[in-house]
Regions:
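Active-site neighborhoods and metal-handling regions in enzymes and metal-associated proteins
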Residues: 1-387
């Protein structure tokens, strides 16, 4: 799979627009989760999230950690509480990002989490633990469990993910917003990418443009022969072409794209880039309700031919949403690389969202094209539209 260096600190714009994703949206999600809790006979659910893997936590609360992590305590009945690894002075800001009223600061989420569960009367309960990113620091997790010796714990790491597969109208609107920001960044990057400029200068310009457009986070990989994460050591001047992978998080949701900028009159390179776009179109033609996820891979294999082995190393497709990489995945290996428990759905449904990408080499030069799509009744629809 394709990996960008993730931020230790999310330093981009952080807001919540209740008109775009209103509280009623979260209530519907909460009702569905509680229905599943009832089916599993759970009294409460503890959801962990951090700044790398926050999708399940955010799905119910709209909150995403900018540094470190936190938990949501979700009773089967009653109010949700958020316990976040932040300072008390940061609580007022955290409350602007969530509809949850009970937001608390903690520097020891495990121990304080146990106290919170006891406070709510769950010291002898059946409690589910959802930590799909497996990021809960082990010492803190062990402290929480050891402080509640009479609790019956149940792993629920994959419990919420199936509910996130099909996006609601509000989610799709948010993803189109993210796609619109990403399109502006892709278009604006053309002005920065010129022969003779140093790589780190261009990356800094792209990063600043994304932040100016309201991005919460951005992943950038670039290169002529291989994709590299940003580094001040990338002091070389770019040559006659540059491949750029971009993913932007905006209002919690991700959109992804890949572009190859050709700076010289190289007919073979231009033909290869055109071919990459044609292959993505062929793959996107498989994005129909009721279609098999595996068909995307089959078409890619047929269209890429000898380039398939190289392209598949980077990953050809995956779901996208609150996670940069989420179900459905094409195969178990792709899922395992990003820590997912399974490939997820094997059949496409309307309003699923996927990122498609093709990366291969021709005459020692990297060619990249990718886009993010919604599955609609009339076929694939790009999320990268003008705002």
């Amino acid at each position: 799979m394709i990996f960008g260096r993730h931020s230790v600190l999310k330093r981009g714009c952080s807001t919540w627009n209740p008109q775009q994703v209103p509280q009623a949206e979260f209530q519907a999600r909460l009702d569905a989760v509680r229905q599943e809790m009832g089916r599993r006979n759970l009294d409460a659910l503890v959801i962990y999230g951090d700044n790398y893997s926050f999708a399940d936590l955010c799905y119910l609360t709209n909150y995403f950690p900018k540094v470190r992590g936190g938990i949501a305590v979700v009773p089967r009945d009653g109010a949700i509480s958020l316990l976040l690894n932040i300072g008390s002075r940061d609580v007022p800001f955290a409350k602007t990002l969530t509809w949850v009223d009970d937001v608390r600061a903690s520097n020891q989420v495990g121990g304080d989490g146990a106290k919170l569960l006891k406070e709510k009367g769950f010291d002898k309960a059946k409690i589910g633990l959802a930590d799909s990113g497996q990021g809960f620091p082990l010492p803190q997790l062990e402290e929480m469990k050891s402080s509640l010796p009479q609790v019956a714990w149940q792993d629920c790491h994959s419990m919420i993910q199936p509910q996130r597969l099909v996006k609601t109208a509000q989610e799709l609107s948010a993803m189109r917003e993210a796609g619109g920001v990403l399109k502006e960044v892709c278009d604006g990057a053309r002005d920065f990418i010129r022969p003779g400029r140093k790589e780190y200068e261009i990356v800094a310009d792209i990063d600043r443009l994304a932040r100016d457009k309201g991005a919460e986070d951005i992943r950038i990989l670039t290169g002529e022969k291989r994709l590299n994460p940003p580094s001040f050591k990338q002091a070389a001047n770019i040559g006659d072409h540059w491949a750029v992978y971009l993913a932007v998080q905006h209002e919690r949701y991700w959109a992804e794209a890949g572009r190859t900028f050709i700076l010289a009159n190289d007919a073979k390179l231009k033909d290869a880039y055109t071919r990459a776009q044609e292959i993505i179109t062929a793959m996107a033609n498989q994005l129909k309700p009721g279609g098999a996820v595996a068909a995307i891979d089959e078409i890619a294999q047929r269209e890429l031919g000898e380039f398939y082995a190289t392209a598949s190393v980077y990953g050809l497709a995956n779901g996208i949403g609150l996670n940069q990489w989420e179900a459905p995945f094409l195969n178990e290996d792709d899922a395992r690389q990003v820590g997912a428990a399974s490939v997820g759905a094997t059949t496409l449904n309307e309003h699923m969202t996927l990122a498609l990408r093709v990366i291969f080499e021709t005459e020692g030069k990297l060619v990249l094209f990718g886009d993010s799509f919604e599955v609609t009744a009339s076929g694939a629809k790009s999320l990268l539209q003008d705002k």
